[in-house]
Amino acid sequence: MLVLGIESSCDETGLALYDTQRGLLAHALHSQIAMHRDYGGVVPELASRDHIRRALPLLEEVMAQSGTRRDDIDAIAFTQGPGLAGALLVGASIANALALAWNKPTVGIHHLEGHLLSPLLVDEPPPFPFVALLVSGGHTQLMRVTDVGVYETLGETLDDAAGEAFDKTAKLIGLGYPGGPEVSKLAETGTPGAVVLPRPMLHSGDLDFSFSGLKTAVLTQMKKFEAAKLDGEALERAKADLARGFVDAAVDVLVAKSLAALKKTKLKRLVVAGGVGANRQLRAALSAAAAKRGFDVHYPDLALCTDNGAMIALAGALRLGRWPEQANADYAFTVKPRWDLASLAG
């Protein structure tokens, strides 16, 4: 089965072709980072308009890359939610218009299911079941993944997502957009232990997260720098140490909770997905801690940690392979800006 995947939930337009026999044939992505940088965040209306401009050129690109003709495609998968309503509508409309013109069925995909399944795109994918750490700008969750469509929430953030905390910390420190990669880069130049920040809910006894207090601790520390009248090189060193303290605290919590989830479920495999899953400090800490305890950790390719069409095409192929009745051939569709992953069933 050959599936075209279309991702448009936020500020990346992604298209890809996935074949159940040959794997990922082609994927192309356009990021809107440069467009939103002047605003310090994603502007929904601009995001929607840009998806309209980018989708068809990206389609032509993946078709040319793979030598695929429209007659070769069996179905079209699109991100149905969650995400920005306007952005979702653009992707859904394009998917259904193509499907109508080409006489193909469609299937709507949960964006987070795409992330959960994205590590299956590697050459040696992890077998089910596994624990998944889904960590991104909008979500931080630990899930038990028994099979496609069989997901149990083990823990989740009670306030800010980890990626959101990274972005807000970057803004507090005075870094550019997008903040997550910038604060991580700065942290690598900081001195370990120079600034020690709290590890929220580290010993809470459950698998939930909280990152708002960590963000507040960063703000408090910045006020101390201001009161001390730090400037110039001294201020830059202090900011680097603060970034290091923040990243170390966030990573410690993510690692500890992930290991606790593996222990609770008695599973041996952890899958890490979502944009923050590309963070080098998190990958290194998780891999080291897991290896000491005999656990395996699986990551998607770095290029597939961000939102992308490949994960949507894969999820569509897996769903249609198991449940052909989910194929929609009447081209009526809805989008779901809010959509609980735990409610998703086969």
Curated annotation (Swiss-Prot):
Cofactor note: Binds 1 Fe(2+) ion per subunit.
Primary enzyme class: transferase
Organism of origin: Burkholderia cenocepacia (strain HI2424)
Positions bound to substrate: 134-138, 167, 180, 279
Gene it is expressed from: tsaD
UniProt family annotation: Belongs to the KAE1 / TsaD family.
Cofactor(s) recorded in Swiss-Prot or TrEMBL: Fe(2+)
This protein's UniProt keywords: Acyltransferase, Cytoplasm, Iron, Metal-binding, Transferase, tRNA processing
Chief location: cytoplasm
EC number: 2.3.1.234
Location(s) in or outside the cell: Cytoplasm
Name of the protein this chain belongs to: tRNA N6-adenosine threonylcarbamoyltransferase
Annotated Gene Ontology cellular component terms: cytoplasm
Binding site for Fe cation: 111, 115, 307
Catalyzed chemical reaction(s): L-threonylcarbamoyladenylate + adenosine(37) in tRNA = N(6)-L-threonylcarbamoyladenosine(37) in tRNA + AMP + H(+)
UniProt-listed GO biological process terms: tRNA threonylcarbamoyladenosine modification
Function, in words: Required for the formation of a threonylcarbamoyl group on adenosine at position 37 (t(6)A37) in tRNAs that read codons beginning with adenine. Is involved in the transfer of the threonylcarbamoyl moiety of threonylcarbamoyl-AMP (TC-AMP) to the N6 group of A37, together with TsaE and TsaB. TsaD likely plays a direct catalytic role in this reaction.
